[in-house]
Amino acid sequence: IKFTDKSTTRLGERDEEGNLTEESMQRVLKTLKRFKEYCKSNGVNQIVTAATSAVREAPNGRDFLNRVQSDVDIQIELISGSEEARLIYLGVLSGMVLEDKSYVIIDIGGGSTELILADQKDAIALTSSRVGAVRLKNDFFLDSEPINRERSNFLRTFIQGSLEPSIEKIKRRLPKGKTVSMIATSGTAISLGNLILSDLGSQNKRCMVINLKKK
């Protein structure tokens, strides 16, 4: 890894018809132009890009990809939820040394959550659910009302129901008699992990927060 950067574009913002908003698309176009200029100035000859749930589900998603091609001259691959899960698994493999046991990997994104059952050799089950941090915020927290117990219970039930098909698929493929560990990725996972550590103590072995650094 030579360089890392991140830009929050909130592409998952939708209008009343579920389309990507002009403001969010403009933010993405501006970001892609900046990244492309950086690649050009550093001699990069191949740019690999992918679009996930926000573009997959928007009625104007493919129109937006055509716009990127026209305005920025970058071709973005629209990947499925399963392919997104597979790439998350490969990302974990590239950044961590997995032991000879089973792992459940969870990635909480803006519009979807991926659950993966895997080991050090292969991904055994790949799942993707239409529940994510930005989606939940847009659907349930547009007002400024505090989250009371009733609202919290409803949201918990909604999330559990949304994830149930993925969880059942993982459970059916779980190997018997093997230790299973969980790995959570994404910024949401890091924030939750830090909250857990602040409550349990940084020396607690039940939860570790690992920030991968470039070499």
Can you annotate each of these PLM segments?
Residues 14-42, 52-102, 117-120, 125-215:
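Helical "lid/coupling" subdomains associated with nucleotide-phosphate turnover
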Residues 1-6, 42:
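N-terminal glycine-rich anion-binding loops that anchor highly charged ligand groups
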Residues 45:
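Short acidic/polar active-site loop segments enriched in Thr and Asp
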Residues 1, 113-117:
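Short beta-strand scaffold segments in enzyme catalytic cores
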Residues 3, 51-52:
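A secondary-structure boundary/capping signal
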Residues 9-10:
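Pseudouridine synthases involved in rRNA/tRNA modification
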Residues 107:
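Conserved catalytic-loop position in the HRD/HxD motif
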